[in-house]
């Protein structure tokens, strides 16, 4: 059944009333585009069965910075995630982040598994490992070496591109660009 509506807690209640609780809820490359994440989390919590899981895939901000994936940063993406804030966000909504898989999609993403608080799954070691790495990188500090280096590498890319375009113009060549 396809429901032509935006997902929220009210829709989740209707789904549960008609079909029962869900053992699996998925969302791929959408979570970062949602304005009201709290409402989505409330809906997911209402929809999940006691042993159910919510699996979503989204950009991983650490990979974005380390891999220079700034071309994916644009207006549709309202959030860029790291693991610690995700853990706190789901805890606030009575859920727990129990597993994370790093995947190469879109320059570096994470596939996260969330369950209701106290659910049957044990927390995978990778969750704590990624949180420890984020803390070591000082990802929450805009003046951390990670971001200073990121800024420097972006400026270097700008210099290289500007130089290349000047060289091409000097050779009488024309350049064209297109973007979405």
Residue ranges and their predicted role:
Residues 1-14:
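Conserved SAM-binding strand-loop segment of SAM-dependent methyltransferases
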Residues 23-26:
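A conserved beta-strand element that flanks and buttresses the S-adenosyl-L-methionine
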Residues 30:
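Hydrophobic adenine-recognition pocket in adenosine-nucleotide-binding enzymes
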Residues 38-55:
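A short glycine-rich, Lys/Arg-flanked "PGG" loop and its adjoining helix->strand segment in the class I
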Residues 56-79, 83-85:
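Short, glycine-/aromatic-enriched active-site segment of Class I SAM-dependent methyltransferases
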Residues 95-106:
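Conserved S-adenosyl-L-methionine
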Residues 106-153:
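Flexible, glycine-/basic-rich loop-and-beta segments that form/coincide
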Residues 153-171:
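A short, well-structured juxtamembrane/interface segment
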């Amino acid at each position: 059944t396809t429901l032509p509506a935006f997902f929220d807690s009210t829709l989740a209640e209707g789904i549960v009333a008609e079909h029962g609780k869900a053992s699996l809820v998925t969302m791929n490359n959408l979570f970062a585009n949602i304005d009201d994440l709290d409402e989505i989390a409330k809906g997911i919590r209402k929809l999940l069965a006691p042993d159910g899981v919510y699996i979503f895939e989204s950009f991983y901000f650490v990979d974005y910075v380390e891999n220079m994936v700034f071309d994916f940063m644009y207006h549709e993406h309202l959030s860029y995630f790291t693991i610690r804030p995700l853990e706190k966000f789901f805890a606030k909504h009575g859920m727990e982040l129990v597993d994370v898989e790093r995947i190469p999609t879109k320059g570096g993403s994470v596939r996260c598994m969330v369950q209701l608080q106290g659910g049957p799954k044990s927390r995978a070691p990778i969750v704590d490992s990624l949180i420890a790495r984020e803390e070591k990188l000082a990802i929450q500090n805009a003046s951390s070496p990670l971001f200073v280096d990121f800024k420097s590498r972006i400026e270097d890319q700008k210099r290289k591109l500007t130089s290349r375009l000047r060289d091409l113009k000097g050779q009488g060549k024309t350049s064209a660009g297109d973007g979405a």
